[in-house]
Amino acid sequence: MNNQIDFVLPVLYDKFLSEMGEDGEFNLEDSGITLYSKADLVERNTTYQIEEWEPDYLMIGQDGDLAFFIKKDSDDTIYMNDLGALGSIQMEIAASDVYEFIK
C-alpha cells in the first residue's frame, strides 16, 4: 500500500474522519473498539497486510483480533472480520454506516 489512500472514501466515513481530525483515535465507549484517524489508516493496513488478504477493503478500526472495514469505492457499509481469518471467510456487515456503528 502506498503512503496515501488512492480511492474515494464513502461520504459519511469521510465526514466522520474530518470531524475526528487528522491525528488520534476514536474509542467507542465501554466496547474496546478503536477507529483509526486518517493519519493511521495506511500504517495499520500495511502492518496487517490488508491489501494482500482483502484487497477490496480498508481496515478502519479494531477490537483485539476483530477488525472493522469499509469496502473501497463503495457505499458507507461497515464490515467486520477476524484478522486471523482474512481472505478465508466472507466479511460480515456490522452497520450501514459509521454513525450507526458508533451509536
Language-model region placement:
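A surface-exposed partner-binding patch
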Residues: M1-F69, S74
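A short, surface-exposed interaction/processing loop segment used at functional sites
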Residues: Y79-V98
